[in-house]
Amino acid sequence: MKAGSLIGVTDSTEAMQKLSHVWMPLGKRVIIIGGGLVGLELAEFLIARGRQVCVLESGTHLGRELSIVRRWRVLHGVAEHGGQMLTGITVTAIEGNRVRYQTADGQSADVRGDSVVLASGAMPDTRLGDALSSAGLNVTSIGDCQSLGYIEGAIAAGHRAGREA
């Protein structure tokens, strides 16, 4: 049994948030591969805890999954606190504390950090739903197995599916 669970610390979200300002298992310079919802919110979280971040995004735009107002606020906050954000990047290697990449115009470059986090997105796994549908069962996909998004959308879709069943 871990010490945190013995004293109830890990049961308290508030306690965990406070502790994350004191200690985290990440270095001071963090490279985040992926500039979508997860990558940008992680960058924002880490900056609030005194980390330097560099976000590498393969696409041309950052935070496409975020609402416009939220995206603007996160991008502004990351930039305002010295976060580096690069788009059109193809990561070619992760070697120790260095991430090598190629820019959209073919230039090779690298960035160094103490920690690397992969936040390059997720793809829904539809195999179970597809197999059940193929077996003749009525399947309604909701949440991230339908499309990536916020929990509110998944809850609303589940409510609709329940009413229509």
List the model feature ranges, each with a label.
Residues 64-92:
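N-terminal Rossmann-like dinucleotide/flavin-binding domain of flavoprotein oxidoreductases
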Residues 1, 87-98:
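A conserved short coil-to-beta-strand element within the FAD-binding core of flavoproteins
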